[in-house]
From Swiss-Prot:
This is Late expression factor 1. SUPFAM superfamilies: Prim-pol domain (SSF56747). GO terms for molecular function: DNA binding; DNA-directed RNA polymerase activity. The keyword Protein biosynthesis does not apply. It comes from the Viruses. InterPro entries: DNA_primase_LEF1. It comes from Orgyia pseudotsugata multicapsid polyhedrosis virus (OpMNPV). The gene is LEF-1. Belongs to the baculoviridae LEF-1 family. Signal peptide: none annotated. Required for late and very late gene expression. Gene3D superfamilies: DNA primase, PRIM domain (3.90.920.10). Keywords: Early protein, Transcription, Transcription regulation. GO terms for biological process: viral genome replication.
Length: 243
């Protein structure tokens, strides 16, 4: 039997990050691998950990609420990266673009997680405008806000738009903001995950067998980068403009 991929501490972090954790069904990938769907709820992180150990669990996914609905989760993947450094650069740029877009909106971002494979998951707070039971039409409206255009014209980018935020994020990490670079680093949001509230989603801090890594929180480091770059601009640094 392979060693357990989880510690009690990691399961506790995962448990604490799941809303309605004691009345929410979970789905599991075993080491074999195959999917297992637990029929009962878990009362505590300790009970969940015991289940994970007993069943040789690898991945943990959160299902929608019993009455329907699920958190708004922006799932963005970056394919064809040359190495881990390029992947994490694209993850940081893409996630930062969303942080900039939602900047000043306290009811928006809950957390941003590296998925453990090739992208990130941004969880939006469901106590504000992004309610769990929101209609699919509203989710699709927001998806279109984040959808990558076929081409960009710098003069047509409106301040505060998502395109503007991607451009600012690209400049923040690369020091350039040409249209081709903005399109290259534009985060590709999974429409199915974002728009369909009946889809299960990876639990924060869980293991990802595809990537061989754990989901981890990026929120604080992204906030620090934005703060540092903003201070640099105020001190006379170069603002994010296109070249």
């Amino acid at each position: 039997m392979a060693p357990c991929k989880y510690t009690p501490e990691r399961v506790q972090m995962m448990w604490d990050a799941i809303a309605y954790n004691d009345s929410r069904r979970l789905a599991f990938m075993t080491d074999r691998p195959r999917w297992v769907h637990a029929h009962n709820f878990f009362d505590s992180a300790a009970q969940l950990f015991a289940y994970i150990v007993k069943n040789s669990i690898s991945d943990v996914h959160v299902k929608p609420l019993e009455e329907g609905g699920r958190e708004w989760v922006i799932d963005a993947d970056f394919k064809d990266c040359a190495d881990k450094a390029e992947l994490m650069l694209k993850v940081n740029v893409g996630a930062t673009a969303f942080m900039l877009f939602f900047e000043g909106k306290e009811d928006a971002v809950q957390r941003i997680m590296f998925s453990g494979n090739r992208g990130f998951h941004l969880w939006l707070k469901f106590c504000g405008k992004f309610k769990m039971d929101a209609p699919k039409s509203l989710r699709e409206h927001w998806f279109n806000v984040f959808k990558q255009p076929a081409k960009l014209v710098s003069g047509d980018i409106r301040p505060g738009s998502f395109a503007d935020c991607v451009r600012r994020a690209v400049h923040m990490y690369i020091g350039d903001a040409r249209e081709d670079l903005v399109l290259r680093y534009w985060p590709d949001v999974d429409r199915d995950v974002f728009c369909n509230a009946n889809k299960q989603i990876r639990a924060p801090f869980s293991y990802n067998y595809k990537g061989g890594d754990y989901s981890r929180c990026l929120t604080q480091q992204l906030q620090q980068r934005i703060k540092a770059c903003s201070a640099g601009c105020l001190a006379g640094g170069t603002p994010p403009t296109s070249k």
